[in-house]
Swiss-Prot record:
<keyword id="KW-0486">Methionine biosynthesis</keyword>
<comment type="function">
    <text>Catalyzes the oxidation of 5,10-methylenetetrahydrofolate to 5,10-methenyltetrahydrofolate and then the hydrolysis of 5,10-methenyltetrahydrofolate to 10-formyltetrahydrofolate.</text>
</comment>
<feature type="binding site">
    <location>
        <begin position="164"/>
        <end position="166"/>
    </location>
    <ligand>
        <name>NADP(+)</name>
    </ligand>
</feature>
<keyword id="KW-0511">Multifunctional enzyme</keyword>
<protein>
    <recommendedName>
        <fullName>Bifunctional protein FolD</fullName>
        <ecNumber>1.5.1.5</ecNumber>
        <ecNumber>3.5.4.9</ecNumber>
    </recommendedName>
</protein>
<keyword id="KW-0554">One-carbon metabolism</keyword>
<dbReference type="Pfam" id="PF00763">
    <property type="entry name" value="THF_DHG_CYH"/>
</dbReference>
<dbReference type="GO" id="GO:0000105">
    <property type="term" value="P:L-histidine biosynthetic process"/>
</dbReference>
<dbReference type="InterPro" id="IPR020867">
    <property type="entry name" value="THF_DH/CycHdrlase_CS"/>
</dbReference>
<keyword id="KW-0521">NADP</keyword>
<keyword id="KW-0028">Amino-acid biosynthesis</keyword>
<dbReference type="GO" id="GO:0006164">
    <property type="term" value="P:purine nucleotide biosynthetic process"/>
</dbReference>
<dbReference type="Pfam" id="PF02882">
    <property type="entry name" value="THF_DHG_CYH_C"/>
</dbReference>
<dbReference type="GO" id="GO:0004477">
    <property type="term" value="F:methenyltetrahydrofolate cyclohydrolase activity"/>
</dbReference>
<comment type="subunit">
    <text>Homodimer.</text>
</comment>
<dbReference type="GO" id="GO:0009086">
    <property type="term" value="P:methionine biosynthetic process"/>
</dbReference>
<feature type="binding site">
    <location>
        <position position="189"/>
    </location>
    <ligand>
        <name>NADP(+)</name>
    </ligand>
</feature>
Length: 282
């Protein structure tokens, strides 16, 4: 069994981005990511701090807009519009979730696609579905693909199962795997017999937010397992969606949690931001 070490790979990517940023600065461009946080969700605050720290580590300027939970939708849209027209800002990220009175889809669609470094704008989703690399790809699925590529895992012809059909991970992940030549099945909350799919799979990507959802009796020998789940137990321990101790015994490759997909997600956010800044140079 080989651990897919996202922490080590993300550190390498950050070093490469640091060099790219030095080049951009020599051309008068400072990569800049604007992050908007609405309210005081503790988990969201932690994520925003980690993103700001990661930006600092590789030479990206980070702007954090921490807004009151009672901000109106129009006020938030006005801020995004200002950032859309600010040439010094190359990436805009709105930290989810948003308060109930704000329409998430409307907010995400208001970010100009050329600064949508999360890859959620319909234009970028369209590029992905057409198999084009013109836009920005969603960070978590992109991070998974980079991780698999780094370990020279050939996806062509593999039977891949994705557990979870969200617009953030499951659906774009399915499209990326399809574009890479895999045969893809997407399982979700309505799937009647999950094991029927997972037992045949060469590659399983789990992104459901459910502790121990994937167990050893549900996988075949030699399976490749990518655990996107992040769950905090009552003890405070962070675990994924996979019964790691048992499933790892049958796996050829598996990601740990933490230290697998999480660091890669942030690395891809940084990479997309630098890509946007480089586009400005071109």
């Amino acid at each position: 069994m080989t651990l897919l070490d996202g922490k080590a790979l993300s550190a390498k990517i950050k070093e490469e981005l640091k060099e790219k940023n030095q080049f951009l600065k020599s051309k008068g461009i400072e990569s800049c990511l604007a992050v908007i946080l609405v309210g005081d969700n503790p988990a969201s605050q932690t994520y925003v701090k980690s993103k700001a720290k990661a930006c600092e580590e590789c030479g990206i300027k980070s702007l954090v807009y921490h807004l009151n939970e009672n901000i109106t939708q129009n006020e938030l849209l006005a801020l995004i519009n200002t950032l859309n027209h600010d040439d010094s800002v190359h990436g805009i990220l709105v930290q989810l979730p948003l308060p109930d009175h704000i329409c998430k889809d409307l907010i995400l669609e208001s970010i100009i696609s050329s600064k949508d470094v999360d890859g959620f704008h319909p234009i970028n989703v369209g590029y992905l579905n057409l198999g084009l690399e013109s836009g920005f790809l969603p960070c978590t699925p992109l991070g998974v693909m980079k991780l698999l590529k780094a370990y020279e895992i050939d996806l062509e012809g593999k039977d891949a199962v994705i557990i979870g059909a969200s617009n953030i991970v499951g659906r774009p992940m399915a499209t990326m795997l399809l574009n890479a030549g895999a045969t893809v099945s997407v399982c979700h909350i309505k799937t009647k017999d999950l094991s029927l799919y997972t037992r045949q799979a060469d590659l399983i990507i789990v992104a459901a937010g459910c502790v121990n959802l994937l167990r050893s009796d549900m996988v075949k020998e030699g399976v490749i397992v990518v655990d996107v789940g992040i769950n905090r137990l009552e003890s405070g321990k962070i675990v994924g969606d996979v019964d790691f101790e048992e499933v790892s015994k049958k796996s050829s490759y598996i990601t740990p949690v933490p230290g697998g997909v999480g660091p890669m997600t942030i690395a891809m956010l940084l990479e997309n931001t630098v890509k946007s800044a480089k586009n400005r140079l071109n």
